[in-house]
Amino acid sequence: MATWITTPAELDAYFQQRPARIGLDTEFIRERTFWPQLALVQMAVGQDILLIDPLIPGMTEALAPWLADESIIKVMHSASEDLVAFKWACGVLPRPLFDTQIGASLAGIGGGMGYQKLVAEITGVALAKGETRSDWMRRPLSESQLQYAADDVEHLFALHDAIDAKLQALGRQQWLHDDGERLLASVANDEDRWPHLAMRSAQFLDAPAQRRLLRLLRWRDVQARSSDRPRSWILDNELAATLARTPPADAAALATLFEQFPKAPRKLAGAVWQALDTPLADEAEAPLALPANDTNKQALKRLQDAVAERSRELGLPDGVLASRKHLESYLERANGRPHWRAGAAGAGVAAAGAAAGTLKRRARRRIAIRLPSKAMKKGDPDHRAALCIPAVRWREDPPPWQRLTSSCSARHRRCAVRCRPQPYSSRSHP
């Protein structure tokens, strides 16, 4: 039977004898805000299940010291969004963290398993899913909501015991610790310096357009955080990409363009214009999303095959040792894997990476982009931009995987865009 906690004193009473671990989960709303609005905190302490009302004044402040206490293990499942909610509401992150979803993946039980499925796999208990989309800000909560909330933490200790035992037997407890620390660090430092790389449309934009897109997305993020509104309510991705690709000549042209987009931020038109037209101090350092070609697809396929073979040897589910995103990052920057994975991947993956780095695409003239990342379909209307991007030197002293030859493979015939080639020199770029 769960206990409803309505005062900080009631919460503190359960920590008079400091527990070795607590189970945690949250319910929150994030439909109309940038930050999640914490609506309920579920906590397992020993044999007790606590349902803590964070809407009561002083409750989040009372909760914060126990979340931050590093002598207490925090057992959670798929914790990333819950961590953001705790950070915003309580000002702290729960650590040390034992994420049962990550742990189940590393233990070879299954990758990306939901809580209900993992509970059924380990304990045999079938849990209901009926209140997933419930209104958790409403008071009082219904009996079915209370039962659903209690179920979310009731079995966390059983999962913790089973998964930790298997990780210990496999010698992978440090793996889980590393991934937990990485997750906590990503939530603590959640401002993405290069948000344009996460947009698929960026790979179809040339270098100046990508920099304009970066300006708009940086501005949008600041506005969303300060006004506590979803990013898409400030400026949606489609409009941002359109503005970056074909910037309006003046403010009047911007207003005309906004008429084509019902959700355009007309009241912020002046700020959008200023953001679009004002270079960032660090935009010259920005990595650019590179289009894919046959060479890159071959390189990615080699790495995927090598990773899949190594994953089978380790008994890991697909995508755990290295996801597609990790491999694309590895190809793009040769730095895509968390550090425990570097050793676990083994020589086979390293060899595949080395082989991928030597692949070259041969067309009418050679392109020597060694290791770009993003996928791109041939025949795309913006394919012409992709063909011309390699003709530009990206930075004065690029790393080996960014070395470029002097001209675009299209030779201006298929794209009708005049490149400004800069000769490649092996002496200036050893």
What are these regions (language model features)?
Residues 415, 419-429:
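Short, intrinsically disordered C-terminal tails of secreted or membrane-associated proteins
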Residues 360-393, 397:
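Positively charged N-terminal leader segments that act as targeting/secretion signals
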Residues 1-22, 26:
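N-terminal accessory regions of nucleic-acid-interacting proteins
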Residues 143, 159, 163-360:
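Accessory DNA-binding and partner-docking regions appended to nucleic-acid-acting proteins
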Residues 32, 39-43:
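Non-catalytic, usually N-terminal nucleic-acid engagement modules in DNA/RNA processing proteins
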Residues 42, 47-62, 66-157, 164, ...:
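Active-site-proximal helix-loop-helix substrate-binding element of RNase H-like nuclease domains
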